[in-house]
């Protein structure tokens, strides 16, 4: 289970996403994360634990942006960790996900043969290589 929020605005969205994640925290408190688009670059801050921990990291990393996604996670696959926390990002895309990718083992084997490397055991990480053009 998890909680997901996304916002696109002409104003800074980080604090709004953070406040929304606080309201969604009952859906997952094992890890939390936010990714924003700022000046054409994806910035990502994640942590193990509750949204309060995430807020400290956001302040430390000065996360800003007018487009962003956030996620709180209840770990059902993979241990609670910063590495397994969402969002998962590449250079040009950031993804959050709720649920199970049924053919994840087969998909991962296929992508590893193609040379892809994975940082986490989260199902969501499998979608990043396939989203690149």
Region annotations inferred by a language model:
Residues 1-105, 109-113:
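N-terminal glutamine amidotransferase
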Residues 72, 123-124:
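Ser/Thr-glycine-rich phosphate-binding loops at phosphate-binding pockets of nucleotides
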Residues 124-130:
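Conserved small/polar residues in nucleotide/adenosyl-binding loops
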């Amino acid at each position: 289970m998890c909680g997901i929020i996304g916002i696109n605005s002409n104003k800074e969205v980080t604090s709004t996403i953070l406040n929304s994640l606080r309201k969604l925290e009952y859906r997952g408190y094992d890890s939390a994360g936010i990714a924003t688009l700022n000046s054409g670059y994806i910035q990502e801050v994640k942590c193990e634990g509750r949204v309060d921990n995430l807020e400290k990291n956001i302040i430390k990393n000065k996360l800003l942006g007018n487009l962003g996604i956030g996620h709180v996670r209840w770990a059902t696959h993979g241990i609670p960790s910063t590495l397994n926390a969402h969002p998962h990002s590449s250079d040009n895309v950031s993804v959050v996900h709720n649920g199970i990718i049924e053919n994840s083992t087969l998909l991962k084997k296929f992508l590893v043969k193609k040379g892809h490397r994975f940082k986490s055991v989260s199902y969501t990480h499998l979608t990043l290589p396939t989203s690149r053009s």
